[in-house]
């Protein structure tokens, strides 16, 4: 790196001399560029020094380094209070207590798995921070609760669609096949311009909304696009929405 910079400097010295003789105010024009080149050279020198230091310190295998040495080398600070002796905290359990723990583990896993399933969303709810970033002229009279209610209906539809698409031919009911045929027709109209099969159109969501929210659906779309909850693709007279 150093030889490369030096060679460039030597080649440009003659050009600088010619420019100084023929161009007025050349020094004031070229001085910022020269300072930038000097800063780049300093950065390259620092990088070369760090590389050499890394090669010198890591000639041996990493198995020879202790955890503290590795943290010091990487610049990781470990507080003394966070270091805990695990062996000292291990307490021998009796057979009765271990049996109770084993019987309670399945129940705890069952309880913890339910919220995880409910938390899985294709279109997540809008947070307060995201709602505040939406311009007021787009929101109008829309509130966070109204927006999240519309988002929840979108998520319900896409979750239902995802489940139907994940079924095998034997698992599909007659109504499922009719819905699939309609979706395939829409995919043909989209002309393969959609990046996903999980999409919806306005007529899919409007019937799911309450009467007071149906007029607000069109106003909610620009707001949801602003916070990147959904994207849209116009194909002829239809507008497709997808997360």
From Swiss-Prot:
The keyword Cell cycle is annotated on this UniProt entry: yes
PANTHER family, alphabetized: SPINDLE AND KINETOCHORE-ASSOCIATED PROTEIN 1
Region Disordered, annotated ranges: 95-116
Residues covered by region (Microtubule binding): 119-243
A molecular function GO annotation: microtubule binding
Keywords in alphabetical order: Cell cycle, Cell division, Centromere, Chromosome, Cytoplasm, Cytoskeleton, Kinetochore, Microtubule, Mitosis
Protein family per UniProt: Belongs to the SKA1 family.
Pfam families: SKA1
Protein name as it appears in the record: SKA complex subunit 1
Function as written in the Swiss-Prot or TrEMBL entry: Component of the SKA complex, a microtubule plus end-binding complex of the outer kinetochore that stabilizes spindle microtubule-kinetochore attachments, promotes alignment of chromosomes at the mitotic spindle equator (chromosome congression) and assists suppression of the spindle assembly checkpoint. Kinetochores, consisting of a centromere-associated inner segment and a microtubule-contacting outer segment, play a crucial role in chromosome segregation by mediating the physical connection between centromeric DNA and spindle microtubules.
Subunit comment: Component of the SKA complex, composed of two copies of ska-1 and a single copy of ska-3. The core complex associates with microtubules and may form dimeric assemblies. Interacts with ska-3 and microtubules.
Polar residues composition bias: residue spans: 95-112
Membrane-spanning segments: none
Record's subcellular location: Cytoplasm, Cytoskeleton, Spindle; Chromosome, Centromere, Kinetochore
One BP term from GO: mitotic cell cycle
GO cellular component: cytoplasm; kinetochore; meiotic spindle; microtubule; mitotic spindle; outer kinetochore; spindle microtubule
The organism's place on the tree of life at top rank: Eukaryota
Organism listed in the record: Caenorhabditis elegans
Chief subcellular location: cytoplasm
